[in-house]
Regions:
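Short coil/loop "hinge" linkers that interrupt or connect long alpha-helical coiled-coils or helical hairpins
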Residues: 110-123
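Membrane-active amphipathic alpha-helices enriched in small hydrophobic residues
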Residues: 120-133
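Aromatic-enriched hydrophobic runs in primary sequence
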Residues: 4-6, 131-134, 138
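Entry/fusion envelope ectodomains
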Residues: 16, 20-112, 134-144, 148-510, ...
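Classical eukaryotic N-terminal signal peptides for Sec-dependent ER targeting/secretion
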Residues: 1-19
Length: 516
């Protein structure tokens, strides 16, 4: 870790943050609901990104005048090679600048489209605020404004012409170094350098620029996560410290710099007036410490031995949920949230806002207050879902499903249906030829028994291909089918009434839908 070389004030931030982290402890619990083949993991705390903080980072460059040395000294050759790399990087950035999201040149964008499109579709709206700042820097005079603000200091708040104030930082001054330290030595000392340190120092300073250039170049001007070349750990901590957020939010961010990096963007902006400027867009966690829980769901099917005659339903509301201002923020793509011990970092851009009644779906899927989401099918394929503290196992047909301990081998064989096993003493779950490793997190699991709700449905009238449905929609379809059956019963009855024997009702008249 890079903690040792930080400035004193950053160290104290980190230490307090660390103690804070251990104090919060981890009380993850899990409930498995047999009736709906789902499980909820509770005890997490939120860190929801609700906004962006943009900051401008600058590197001062030197327009190198021709270097007069043509000597054969090995060290001078190294310096010349390094200066060539430097010049190539600057040229590369200038070319790149003409095709980054900040430039408004239409014609040029057409031919850059291929290079960019696939990427920007993914993060287009995500980087809107960073791109906006980046565009302002292209206006006449903006770069000079920043440059002069950073003349005598490495950090300054600059008010841009669109009225937005941004914190600007100068992280590397290659101009000063090349013009005042490097070139005078090379030119003065009859083209030979006595100490190799000069070469090494330049290589190190230059390396950062080369890496930044490479990253921007490979990623068409927008990178995420933000690497340590774009922003070192101490620079990032110092930025966090200057952000307009509460101390709790600062602690949270300083304590999780890796996740902050993953949720941040670096956007190439401009290179002119001997300055390279890029925008770093950091997450603002406006909601922290509210409860979060994760819902895991797996297919629940009937278990008739006759192949192809089974019906299945699966809850489709799996994902992360966090309390947020009286409602619930729901993150359907669980993998977009990053979990660090019991802390869940999610982005509200990927969320839906739901009423808090959505929780009723866990305890009573037929509740009248919230229409719970399900999908239906006839494919009783076996599978397993690894939860925070165990595994849900959907075992159907002739598949072999087992749970094993690494020392004792198989310790449980699952029969057909949906079941759950906690991670106590269990290391792996195997379903057919797929092996799953369970999470080794500590916590209490609760197995809530209940009649599997799929057994309440009549296979004859079950709508078995509803991809995106709800309990009430499925019931509606069933009622339509039942009405249809009643109607055909009547028709048959009328036809048969003319004959001597009446048919006592046809297929389905004896079947009725059981309600909870």
């Amino acid at each position: 870790m890079e903690l040792l070389i930080l400035k004193a004030n950053a160290i104290t931030t980190i230490l307090t943050a660390v103690t804070f982290c251990f104090a919060s402890g981890q009380n993850i619990t899990e409930e498995f609901y047999q009736s709906t083949c789902s499980a909820v993991s509770k005890g997490y705390l939120s860190a929801l990104r609700t906004g962006w903080y943009t900051s401008v980072i600058t590197i001062e460059l030197s327009n190198i005048k021709e270097n007069k040395c043509n000597g054969t000294d090995a060290k001078v050759k190294l310096i010349k090679q390094e200066l060539d790399k430097y010049k190539n990087a600057v040229t590369e950035l200038q070319l790149l600048m003409q095709s980054t999201p900040a430039t408004n040149n239409r014609a040029r964008q057409q031919n850059q489209q291929q290079r960019f499109l696939g990427f920007l579709l993914g993060v287009g709206s995500a980087i809107a605020s960073g791109v906006a700042v980046s565009k302002v820097l292209h206006l006449e005079g903006e770069v000079n404004k920043i440059k002069s603000a950073l003349l005598s200091t490495n950090k300054a708040v600059v008010s841009l012409s669109n009225g937005v104030s941004v914190l600007t930082s100068k992280v590397l001054d290659l101009k000063n170094y090349i013009d005042k330290q490097l070139l005078p030595i090379v030119n003065k000392q009859s083209c030979s350098i006595s100490n190799i340190e000069t070469v090494i120092e330049f290589q190190q300073k230059n390396n950062r620029l080369l890496e930044i250039t490479r990253e921007f170049s490979v990623n068409a001007g927008v990178t995420t996560p933000v690497s340590t070349y774009m922003l070192t750990n101490s620079e990032l901590l110092s930025l966090i410290n200057d952000m307009p957020i509460t101390n709790d939010q600062k602690k949270l961010m300083s304590n999780n710099v890796q996740i902050v990096r993953q949720q941040s963007y670096s956007i190439m902006s401009i290179i002119k007036e001997e300055v390279l400027a890029y925008v770093v867009q950091l997450p603002l966690y406006g909601v922290i410490d509210t409860p979060c829980w994760k819902l895991h769901t797996s297919p629940l099917c009937t278990t008739n031995t006759k192949e192809g005659s089974n019906i299945c339903l699966t809850r489709t509301d799996r994902g992360w949920y966090c309390d947020n201002a009286g409602s619930v923020s729901f993150f359907p793509q669980a993998e977009t949230c990053k979990v660090q011990s019991n802390r869940v970092f999610c982005d509200t851009m990927n969320s839906l806002t739901l009423p808090s009644e959505v929780n009723l779906c866990n305890v009573d899927i037929f509740n009248p207050k919230y229409d719970c989401k399900i999908m239906t099918s006839k494919t009783d394929v076996s599978s397993s879902v690894i939860t925070s503290l165990g595994a849900i196992v959907s075992c159907y047909g002739k598949t072999k499903c087992t749970a094993s301990n690494k020392n004792r081998g198989i310790i449980k064989t699952f029969s057909n249906g949906c079941d759950y096993v906690s991670n106590k003493g269990v290391d792996t779950v195997s379903v057919g030829n797929t092996l799953y490793y369970v999470n080794k997190q500590e916590g209490k699991s609760l197995y809530v028994k209940g009649e599997p709700i799929i057994n309440f449905y009549d296979p004859l009238v079950f709508p078995s291909d509803e991809f995106d449905a709800s309990i009430s929609q499925v019931n509606e379809k069933i009622n339509q089918s039942l009405a249809f059956i009643r109607k055909s019963d009547e028709l048959l009855h009328n036809v048969n009434a003319g004959k001597s024997t009446t048919n006592g009702g046809s297929a389905g008249s004896g079947h009725h839908h059981h309600h909870h």
